[in-house]
């Protein structure tokens, strides 16, 4: 898989978001409700493990789940270490906006 600095994002494609251990982000138990947890899990080709990057303007992206159509969201709008990720219907809040930055390695 290409590094983030090598990937050109397309709003028409779905992507896996992989951790260094090879696990991917997914909606836990393919739950379609607001507040459903997002977790790391073994890749199995499921649509609840696939994500679409939606341009939010100003260099930010919303990350939408293929299966549920909901956005990756910071629980309770949290901004501190340890804040949980969950999914939520699209809002205008910054808790659903993400900036992507290339890494050096």
Name each model-derived stretch.
Residues 35-46, 82-91:
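Surface-exposed turn/loop modules enriched in turn-prone residues
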Residues 2-32, 50-79, 97-105:
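Extracellular glycan-recognition/adhesion modules and their associated mucin-like linkers
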């Amino acid at each position: 898989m290409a590094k983030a600095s090598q990937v050109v994002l397309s709003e028409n494609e779905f992507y896996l978001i992989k951790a260094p251990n090879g696990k991917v982000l997914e909606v836990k138990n393919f739950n379609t409700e607001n507040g459903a947890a997002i977790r790391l899990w073994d890749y199995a080709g499921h649509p609840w493990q696939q994500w679409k990057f939606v341009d939010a303007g100003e260099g930010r992206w919303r990350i939408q789940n293929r299966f549920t159509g909901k956005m990756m969201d910071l629980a309770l709008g949290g901004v501190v270490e340890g804040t949980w990720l969950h999914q939520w219907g699209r809002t205008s809040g910054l808790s659903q906006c993400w900036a992507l930055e290339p890494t050096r390695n």
